[in-house]
Amino acid sequence: MSNIVIAAAKRTAIGSFLGQFNGVPTPTLGAAAIAAALEQSGVPASDVSEVLMGCVLSANLGQAPARQAAIAAGIPLSAGATTLNKVCGSGMKTIMLGHDLIKAGSAKVVVAGGMESMSNAPHMLPNSRTGNRFGNFQAVDHMAHDGLVNAYDGKAMGEFAECAVDKYQFTREEQDAYAIESVRRAQAAQANGAFAGEIVAVKVATRKGEVEFATDEQPGRSDIAKIPTLRPAFKKDGSVTAASSSSISDGAAAVVLLAEEDAAARGITPLARIVGHATHSQEPEWFTTAPIGAIHTLLQKTGWTLDQVDLFEINEAFAVVAMAPMRELGIPHAKINVNGGACALGHPIGASGARLVVTLVNALRTHGGKRGIATLCIGGGEATAIAIELI
């Protein structure tokens, strides 16, 4: 079997919490990304074998969110659809599985990606089915409980970011500087149209009529001057703030995958080939440093050296997640998140893994690079990574 290639890579803009996509269902965002990727690829929807979409906060979405998104995007009913939950790695894992399905001969064309509306995540009433016989009882936030809190001790993800800060002795000033640079890069990318090739506009019904949103919302809301004044977010005497953390967000991303020989037979010029992918797992409380292990494993699989990688997309769940590989592996900041990262753009958890790949493909094209690695940390102590090479 030949290489597996990315024929198209598209995403929606990223909406702020309760912002431009508030009220837009997760599958609707997913459908927009899927439809745009298919259109860009030139592959007929009737040829799609399977749709794989990551989604973490699936409560109250109805049955089979990926199936809903596929049907809304115009994928024929004959194509299968699977919803995948690997927390923040969901959107990237779908691409990894799509790659493997085609390699194994189990599928010919796979649409893979992720989608999330954190704004629409509901509150839940545990034990209500059996009844609470007396007294008050609490609603549980689906977003926090199933997306942002460690399942093993109930601690917020940001508390573990503080552990990584202590390990590497990163100062508050270093984290602020990183976050400020992320915002500056994102704002510059918006100003020069760097995201134009990857974002599809989403139409949203508002009181003023239908409005199209095609711009990431958070960078325009960021005030760099306020970043050094923010209070610690997770620990009284800590140094991780809202600015050096990713914001709660909504969005979706998707890619179209097929074999390189199949693309050639169809007359399609792919964007990139997938050279390899890797997973690294360790202690849940050290999920923040897991991308380092994933990068190591991926380099071994591909035979690449760090110097041969032109650009990295490392998800900024927290600034420290990207700063740790800079410190430990010696990756220059100039190669990481050249158009800004999640500290500036936001982190729709089920979509971010795919969003990184979409942005990496686009950034390599606009920055004259060839090889890139996308990686992100995952709650529970894991990380995934994908290596791509432009064609």
At which residue positions do the language-model features occur?
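Conserved active-site "lid/cap" helical segment
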Residues: 1-61, 65-73, 80, 160-172, ...
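Active-site pocket-lining segment
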Residues: 160-162, 195-198, 205, 275-344
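Flexible glycine-/small-residue-enriched beta->alpha junction loops
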Residues: 109-164
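Conserved catalytic cysteine-centered active-site region
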Residues: 55-110, 151-157, 221-247, 328-355, ...
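Active-site-proximal alpha-helical scaffold in enzymes
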Residues: 86-116, 165-194, 254-261, 326, ...
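Condensing-enzyme catalytic core mediating Claisen C-C bond formation in acyl metabolism
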Residues: 1-24, 139, 224-289, 293, ...
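N-terminal extracellular/periplasmic Venus flytrap/periplasmic-binding protein-like
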Residues: 10-12, 23-24, 29-31, 40, ...
